[in-house]
Amino acid sequence: RFRDESIGHLKEMPIEWSKISLNVDSATDMRQAMMSLAESKKIFALEARMMGLLDETNPEVVANDNDKVEVPVWRYAMINYPHPLLTNGLSILDTPGLNAMGLEPELTLNVIPNAHAVLFLLGIDTGVTRSDMQVWEKHVPPSVSQRIAVLNKIDLMWDDLKPHDEIAQAIQRQTENTSMLLNIPGSRVLAVSAQKALVGKIRGDMPMIQMSGIARLESLLADEIIP
């Protein structure tokens, strides 16, 4: 992070990258490979501060320059996975929240404005927060051809003691409120449960997959986003 090269430039320099094999036939190997993305290391607090990786708002984080703090090992990762949507041309850039915007200006100056679509991931339990609005207004310009909000965790609203219609109405209200706040059509706000979609697919539980709402998101990606 002390260097001036952009991510785009570093992609042309194979020597700068570490390769981790992704064995899709082994759940254990897949888990280990994915866990490696979350690796951390300890460096001096001064270095972390200079790289913008020191959380000054956290009272538990030491401020002494000579103390050691934990920071992520990896700055950027590219994952090649043989999913049908990916093999058909879909590329997904996952930004790790608000901090990435300041630490990687390339994301906001080049990648996001030139994206075919931006999926803005929100929690249906919290809706659009103040910080969400700041990111949306500052970094997701109307010039992006497809601006889509995804309200995740709808399973938090599932309740066996409530009628299905009542739950559906509550989800619809949150969807409409998100549409209004972000100033995008209601059809561009999708309510899903990624966790239940995964469980349903693992178990072959079609009713759970249907309730998760994931099919609508997958159809949008396959039919509208892929060039």
Question: Model-predicted segments: where are they?
Answer:
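Globular "head" domains of long coiled-coil molecular machines
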Residues: R1-I226
